């Protein structure tokens, strides 16, 4: 038991180190994109905290898998310290408490704290009222989110997971079953339903941003950016052309005649365009003479290598996701079970790799962290390229050192939801690994063998799957949270197909696009000249 406790302690210590690394990453990440002129302490802390909570929750996944796998020997028997079922339940409950705590904090952030901070700064920008009036208005709008959260918790608590299978079951029987469900783990069901609903939104965000970013990020690294010198020459020609057009319009009023409304409107547009072109010229001049630009030329081969590596990883994910979904389509128990599969019929690369890495702790920890960070970076690439949209309305643009507090909160909210969906994405890629880790069990073969003594049954060592006996294999708490309601799993299944389609479309679009400007995102028509100070302090 002492050895087991020591190794369990090591697992939790690595989780603690990862927690500190997550906090450091979130701080650097948020500070990189927030506007230094409009930065606010509360919005910064909120963005860092919400993103960190999501990443910490995803970091519990390998701990959960490690604990259930560590309980068993390679020969399929439980270790001495884990033979007692109460001990196993106690260990798993520590993970369950962790999930309860973190998921509750996520609900608090999504439905109360982030909306409140967002609406507070919206009111601050729109009105010059007192702090009390701003807080009152923010609370009024936030109450709608609290109402939605309450409804989700109630639906999750009261929605029965099963219905009587008998044809002659009365409505009274169904109501009795409903209250029986309420009496057992209704808190878990309520929290699971709420988190699954958020994960569903995260799935839509992943389809929109992550799938596109997985193709856009590597191809942008491979193609590189335009040459600053030649881009500046083209911009100088555009400046001369616009200046000539401005002079032509102004020449019409040299004799004292006023300009027509059409000419005044055209002159205003040309002057705005000229202002933008001159700002663009200043930025191009800065990049042309900057030492960092010259260093980037030296680093160009490394960027190409990273781009090739990223596109190979993306293809590995897509192929694994396709094979996993195809396996569910051909061999699952059907849509009413959430497309659950018994065993693995079509193997995919990640489903083979993860159980192998899991035997050498903490290789799977590192791999899961890498997958999560990969999703973060590709999602960020998709958001940066597309901006934050609400249907056909573009709400915010995400730019380095230019992102407003409200946009930063939106950004971290989207990333939080995408990270929540990452756990299900990993399950889609390696369902056996997420459910049981590397657990094995001894299965008694029904066929008998004749021996000198008599007939005897053969014991076969098998990997744990959904058809395994409950007393022989321990299911991870992650799986219980993700698959408490079968209809969410069915929606995720179809969402995976949509993810694959969007990735292919994004890959084609990214291949057809040309190189990006060296000052991409630095100059926009709605920027002021003062915003240059943020780029060139």
From Swiss-Prot:
It comes from the Eukaryota. The chain crosses the membrane at residues 8-28, 48-68, 99-119, 143-163, 187-207, 304-324, 363-383, 407-427, 485-505. It is a multi-pass membrane protein. Residues 29-47, 120-142, 208-303, 384-406, 506-537 are cytoplasmic. It is found in: Endoplasmic reticulum membrane; Lysosome membrane; Cell membrane. It holds the Pfam family LMBR1. Keywords: Cell membrane, Cobalamin, Cobalt, Endoplasmic reticulum, Glycoprotein, Lysosome, Membrane, Transmembrane, Transmembrane helix, Transport. Its main location: endoplasmic reticulum. Residues 1-7, 69-98, 164-186, 325-362, 428-484 are extracellular. InterPro entries: LMBD1_LysCbl_Transport (IPR050854), LMBR1-like_membr_prot (IPR006876). Glycans are attached at residues 75, 85, 168, 345, 445-446, 455. Coiled coil: none annotated. GO terms for molecular function: cobalamin binding. GO terms for cellular component: clathrin-coated endocytic vesicle; endoplasmic reticulum membrane; lysosomal membrane; plasma membrane. One of its GO terms (biological process) is protein localization to lysosome. Belongs to the LIMR family. LMBRD1 subfamily. Lysosomal membrane chaperone required to export cobalamin (vitamin B12) from the lysosome to the cytosol, allowing its conversion to cofactors. Targets ABCD4 transporter from the endoplasmic reticulum to the lysosome. Then forms a complex with lysosomal ABCD4 and cytoplasmic MMACHC to transport cobalamin across the lysosomal membrane. May play a role in mediating and regulating the internalization of the insulin receptor. This is Lysosomal cobalamin transport escort protein LMBD1. It comes from Xenopus laevis (African clawed frog). The lineage of its organism: Eukaryota, Metazoa, Chordata, Craniata, Vertebrata.
